[in-house]
Amino acid sequence: MAGVAQNGHQEMDFCVKVDPLNWEMAADSLKGSHLDEVKKMVAEFRKPVVKLGGETLTVAQVAAIAAKDNAKTVKVELSEGARAGVKASSDWVMDSMSKGTDSYGVTTGFGATSHRRTKNGGALQKELIRFLNAGVFGNGTESCHTLPQSGTRAAMLVRINTLLQGYSGIRFEILEAITKLLNHNVTPCLPLRGTITASGDLVPLSYIAGLLTGRPNSKAIGPNGETLNAEEAFRVAGVNSGFFELQPKEGLALVNGTAVGSGLASMVLFDANILAVFSEVLSAIFAEVMNGKPEFTDHLTHKLKHHPGQIEAAAIMEHILDGSSYVKAPQKLHETDPLQKPKQDRYALRTSPQWLGPQIEVIRSATKMIEREINSVNDNPLIDVSRNKALHGGNFQGTPIGVSMDNARLALASIGKLMFAQFSELVNDYYNNGLPSNLTAGRNPSLDYGFKGSEIAMASYCSELQFLANPVTNHVQSAEQHNQDVNSLGLISARKTAEAVDILKLMSSTYLVALCQAIDLRHLEENLRNAVKNTVSQVAKRTLTMGANGELHPSRFCEKDLLRVVDREYVFRYADDACSANYPLMQKLRQVLVDHALENGENEKNANSSIFQKILAFEGELKAVLPKEVESARISLENGNPAIANRIKECRSYPLYRFVREELGAELLTGEKVRSPGEECDKVFTAMCNGQIIDSLLECLKEWNGAPLPIC
């Protein structure tokens, strides 16, 4: 543990031999389930205070401070215990200057021109900020060339955390000023582009320094969205000390770090972890509405593969499906009629744990890498007060950001690819086990094309997401007179990953709306089948039981086979015109009677015992009553009085359905209504972006004990 030396600087146990390479610490951080980690992240995100001490900052805390809706409610507090260490390093710089010590960035020029020398340390820091203000904003502070306020707030928080550790030679008062800006929701304007994240995020961070020093080109956004100059920003934030005259090393301490890249990466990974869990639950719902076979989640299968991400994904899906009546009903049908559907479900369903598992592991690993980065000291030189020296190294190299963001983005693209494959099966009546083409729910499929437009949109989203999966880090250019000849491109990669997260949210919201549509269609299917079955049974009893003279007729034995036809036939293949001779229901019902007539043999020659003679009577009465009964069943469901309740209420996935239907008011879509699919998808997308969907997602898994079902 860290202690405080007599000189006030934090004293770390760097020489302790236990875990000298930090591998054990990295491994320990991955203990426990990913879901538990996500729950912890959500809890941290919702805490009202983020306490900074330099070593315990999390991606969830960064995301909380960054979030626009949290700006007025979540506050930052600095550890008073860090003050002494920060002061010690600042005093050391001033003392070394007074002794004439030659230090990089304090008495020398920068980068490839570090051979230049000066004794005017304050002026050197001022010039550093001026020449790094090289960003381009375009038309105003809200232009597309300005870093979003959330990204800037994240960067400010991370930079404070780094500087609190006391290795950077900066005054504590400057950190307090940045904290006041955060707590009063005053956000400096930073350029979106212009950094290679080595030597740190020099250009964007220089604009925070520019605001602190009162540069005339500095701008900020106030708590109500107003544009502020530096003087106005200080007044609104309650920074009464006036603009800072930077001491030697303070400008370098502010700009020479990876905070913009790692701050944005933290925001991205908070969302990515939630999206990973979301994809597991959506895959389970997909299995429900597709009447999938649940054995693909059996623990033995996944235990034999050994990968923890896969094992957890399967266990989560198993938990959802174990409590699902959607799975139990088709299971009975598959047992009695194994040819009703293929022996195995297609890959998008059956191998979803194997597909999602590695992506979860990648996202989780990236999260840990970024959490190490936001708790690191990542500038140069580092002030080692205990050994009375400045260390010249390269912690500003943001490679952990670039690499983790490239990897996370590839994982997000893979999740999106699975969603698109599942969505494509869901809307295709050749694959979806009886759901209507395009998930149309209207009475006339010729005037209702359901989710056809949404499938096209999903293809577009998926294509863009796959393009974004291409790595950023292999596009490095040698910079700054070949001094920065390798650089991480961390912020660029984080920006592209933020785009990927946004697109995956578009896909997830569209997919969830489609799944809710499928759930309601299964409900409609069950009620329509029930109405058809009851009607066929009643008509059969009336027309097939008795002969013309009141005797029992041999056609009475047809009823069981007629009802079997209704059970087996996909409802939506005939629902728009149940008695059409062109649709399979009437054809197969007639075939049952024909088959029985053929078996009736010589009895067919007798008009009183002929089954053929009964066909016209049966079909005639069925045509007279069945359309009315089908329409009546549909109307009853639309009015909220269905004969059979919606199975989803008995399922563990119900909280997500309830959220979409009741909390957001997104309704069943039909061609008969004015509302479009995009309007409903927009509701879910907005809710996802605002974090409103998280509680419903976690409620689906509240009973999961963190382990798969036992192998019996």
UniProtKB/Swiss-Prot annotation:
Pathway: Phenylpropanoid metabolism; trans-cinnamate biosynthesis; trans-cinnamate from L-phenylalanine: step 1/1. One of its GO terms (cellular component) is cytoplasm. This is Phenylalanine ammonia-lyase. GO terms for molecular function: ammonia-lyase activity; phenylalanine ammonia-lyase activity. The lineage of its organism: Eukaryota, Viridiplantae, Streptophyta, Embryophyta, Tracheophyta. It catalyses: L-phenylalanine = (E)-cinnamate + NH4(+). CDD domains: PAL-HAL. One of its GO terms (biological process) is L-phenylalanine catabolic process. The keyword Lyase applies. Induction: Strongly induced during the hypersensitive reaction to TMV or to a fungal elicitor. The modification 2,3-didehydroalanine (Ser) is found at S199.
